[in-house]
Amino acid sequence: MTLFILAETSAGYALLKAKDKKLLKRHDIVAETQTAEGVSNLMKLKNFQKFDSAATALEETASLVEGKVTPRLANLLESIKDEKKVSLAVADPKLGNAIAKLPLAIQPIADSTTTDLYRAIREHLPTLIPGLLPGDMSTMSLGLSHSLARHKLKFSPDKIDTMIVQAIALLDDLDKELNTYAMRVKEWYGWHFPELAKILNDNIAYSKVVLKVGMRSNFGETDLAEILPEEIEAVVKAAADRSMGTEISNEDLDNIQALAEEVIGFSTYRQQLASYLAARMTAIAPNLTALVGELVGARLIAHAGSLVNLSKSPASTIQILGAEKALFRALKTKHDTPKYGLIYHASLIGQATGKNKGKMARYLAAKAAIGLRVDALTDWPVDADGNEPTEEEKAALGMQSRYYLEKKLAAMEGKPIKPRGVGIAPNGIPTAQPKKWEINEARKYNPDADGFAGDEDLAESSPKKQKKEKKDKKKKLVEEIKESEDGSESEEESDEDVEMADKSATNGSMADANASSEERSDREEKSKKSKEKSLEKKSKKEDKKSKKQKSGSGPSVEEMAAKAGLSVSRYQRKLERGEIVFDSEGNPSYISKKDLKKAKKEAKKAAKAAEKEAGKKRKRAEEDDEKKTKKKSKV
């Protein structure tokens, strides 16, 4: 089999032919190729196709890096298709796979056996290609490497989102450092003025006040209208007058103010960085930003490495991106896998509650996957004036998807959706943002909490206690049924009837007398009904008491269930099925289903054995009877 060697150089393609067909199987290639004469004895130049210009060299090299066969290389390989049983040594395995797909009877070889051969070709390339000087070769290689690096930097989409990855990482670091420094300022200056930290919650306002005022004694003379409102300023100055803090030296104050200045500088730079990140996200991934927001989108891109890598991920991967630890732990322990990762912090998922969070995460990840592919892979057309589409037009898909998801979430939750920018807690309730400053009223003295002498009256009970007492009274009135005697009731009714009759007689009209008689009859019926109801209630109460007394004579169901180690409902079920067994002392114990089955099988076996024995006894008795009858007949 004839062996050809393909050498890709900065000057062009060189096709070399090996003089020995078994050149790759030889073990002395390194020793033979140490000199130019040895290399020329092993192979010779078959064909050389030179690049026309630097632009052509760049195009060909860029295609080779991606593992593609260019038309120029395909024409070169067609020159050896007439050879019988051709094998071609290639340095790059990707290029070898691409050559194998061509409709040519060429068998590419791209393994470790060709490394020594290509090392020798690179060392002695000018001797193998006539007319190629070593100085020209180095110049062409340097120019090609520079142009190739420039081409990669210009056209690589991964280089743009590097700014986002670095910005979000720096933003997280700034938040940590800012919180640490702000807490250190409060703790440090708190020795001198501890009440200020309780009034001012905002770290920037606190640092500005410390930087402007300095010592606590200067608060009365300093104007803080630029930093604080008038009400808060008055409270701060009043607290400074009666502060319980210790005195500090000027050197201590200088160090505290230097740290406060750092806090203010960090906070201003953080705001600038956050606005820069929002602008970069809107420009690079407008649809993703419209769906999940700037911070969540930037964290997703940073976690995936680049926008292109994230766009290649399916929706299921985007949904749990950032929850890899929980995912692999769940797979290892065979538990439920997590429903969301970094995407959980999106506002749409935050507004969902309960089981709807998982559904919303799935919907949002699916829409985000589509939006990411549009952001990463779409080439936006340019109009006649050379203007690209606006940011709103680029983010149209993301805005439509968000509107659709908001409608779906509103239908699932049955409530209106909160506007963007509202902080949402995990339970779906908007979180109250911390105020910059608070005025806490001092707790007043409660004289009712003191002890009292015997002559004094008790303090009035609180409204909560009064409500409880009223409820207890109502319950007692409902529970207690006052039952009057039948005779007294009848006497009261007769007295009422006599009074009504007297009144009707005084009126002196028969119509009034008839009306009073009808009223009497109605009242009598009502009294009878009330008596019957009271008697029914009495009988029911007596029945309940008797049942309780009967049940109280022995252990209760709850006690028996506790002894058996079962719940009450389960104990009652097993008792009905006959699965509860009592020992000699009356303690219950339950039998499992397996034990019941075994007992039933043993009972069946015992019954069968008893039947067999009974049958045998019958046969014996019959045989004995037959023998007796035979003896009698003989006699």
Curated annotation (Swiss-Prot):
Basic residues: bias regions: 464-476
UniProt-listed GO biological process terms: rRNA processing
Record field: compositional bias (Acidic residues): 486-499
Listed Gene3D superfamilies: 1.10.287.4070, Nop domain (1.10.246.90)
A GO molecular-function annotation: snoRNA binding
Residue segments, region Disordered: 445-635
Source superkingdom: Eukaryota
Principal cellular location given in the protein's record: nucleus
GO-annotated cellular components: box C/D methylation guide snoRNP complex; nucleolus; small-subunit processome
Keywords, ordered alphabetically: Nucleus, Ribonucleoprotein, Ribosome biogenesis, rRNA processing
Chain ranges of the Nop domain: 284-414
Record localization: Nucleus, Nucleolus
Task performed by this protein: Required for pre-18S rRNA processing. May bind microtubules.
PANTHER family, per the entry: NUCLEOLAR PROTEIN 5 NUCLEOLAR PROTEIN NOP5 NOP58, NUCLEOLAR PROTEIN 58
Name used for this protein in its record: Nucleolar protein 58
Organism: Ajellomyces capsulatus (strain NAm1 / WU24) (Darling's disease fungus)
Phylogenetic placement of the source organism: Eukaryota, Fungi, Dikarya, Ascomycota, Pezizomycotina
Gene (name only): NOP58
